[in-house]
Amino acid sequence: MRPLAGGLLKVVFVVFASLCAWYSGYLLAELIPDAPLSSAAYSIRSIGERPVLKAPVPKRQKCDHWTPCPSDTYAYRLLSGGGRSKYAKICFEDNLLMGEQLGNVARGINIAIVNYVTGNVTATRCFDMYEGDNSGPMTKFIQSAAPKSLLFMVTYDDGSTRLNNDAKNAIEALGSKEIRNMKFRSSWVFIAAKGLELPSEIQREKINHSDAKNNRYSGWPAEIQIEGCIPKERS
């Protein structure tokens, strides 16, 4: 009787195990929607994975500022030249006023004049300060700026060798504190206003002198820049 009872117990166990396996398969088929097996397996694996949060791509600001200027201001950025291959740039309200791409920058002092009321550029000129007598024409150009004008000045290569006293006086009259400190191949940027006052917190000028020990480029100092936001005229 014992062998018979043992065999019967094995049969019952096999049948029970088969029923459990069939029922488990049935439940799995009902729970997983009709989809490729690979997709189902991926879904199961993904249950334990943490969601990956992607940081949004930073929005580009006017003149490549890190933070946006208020809507009631003008954005500007002035960049001096650096070495032979780094040309000076003047950007205003995300418009390149002077730069290598436009072909309107050259050795010396580069100047852009902007109408403060409209925000439109009125004139751009470059003046070679290494060769030729260009201090006189530059002085007249600066003095020709109409009232309520913004003047942006940047150097590329040398801006001091042929810079005479009259030109220095004209730039000094606009508020420059560094024009008389200019040396051979000094990097210099300056923002001025004619017929209006700029806010005191705005950085208006920056200079970097050539130094054989510290020059970034052979014979030239590193380029320098200033940027900021100028309040628009209130209507």
Curated annotation (Swiss-Prot):
Sequence intervals crossing the membrane: none
The record's account of how the chain is modified after translation: 2 N-termini have been observed in the mature protein: the first at Glu-30, resulting from signal peptide cleavage, the second at Ser-46.
Pfam family, one: ILEI
Expressed in which tissues: Highly expressed in the pancreas. Also found in the colon, kidney, prostate, small intestine and testis.
GO terms, biological process: apoptotic process; insulin secretion
Keywords, in A-Z order: Apoptosis, Cytokine, Disulfide bond, Glycoprotein, Lectin, Secreted, Signal
Limits of the GG-type lectin domain: 72-233
A GO term from the CC aspect: extracellular space
GO molecular function: carbohydrate binding; cytokine activity
Cysteine-cysteine disulfides: C63-C91, C69-C229
Compartments reported by the entry: Secreted
Signal peptide from the UniProt entry: 1-29
Glycosylation sites: N120, N208
Family of this protein: Belongs to the FAM3 family.
PANTHER family per the UniProt record, alphabetical: UNCHARACTERIZED FAM3
Function noted in UniProt: Induces apoptosis of alpha and beta cells in a dose- and time-dependent manner.
Protein name stated in the entry: Protein FAM3B
Source organism per UniProt: Homo sapiens (Human)
Gene behind the chain: FAM3B
